[in-house]
Amino acid sequence: MSSKNKLMLILGAVLGVLYLLMFRYQLINAQFHELGGLALFALVLVHIFMNRKRITSFISNFHNKPLKARAQIIVDAVFGFSMLTIIGTGVAMAHTLPVNLGAHSDVLITTHTVASFVGLAMMGV
């Protein structure tokens, strides 16, 4: 196994554990939840950067791909959209970080939570 593959495996494991840990909001404090969310965002960007060639080749010629490959692309896109939603609403609602936008409403909380569970479901597909 190459060093890049080992790094990707470790990164994937860290991303998965951190994502699941964020669901236990009641057991961790708000600051850890918010910092963990920002770390998750940074690690997702690293993951995308490290896989950019694979992602590009996977997406190219979408309509010529077999049905299973197209379904996987759609699942990945839904997961990506849920991550963007989680990050956007999380930053908007943050209250323990210097990035305090002060947006805290039931709609944002619900959107953040639903997007989190949609992302979790997409991870399982």
Predicted regions and their residues:
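Membrane-embedded alpha-helical bundles that constitute the cytochrome b-like, heme-associated redox core
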Residues: 1-125
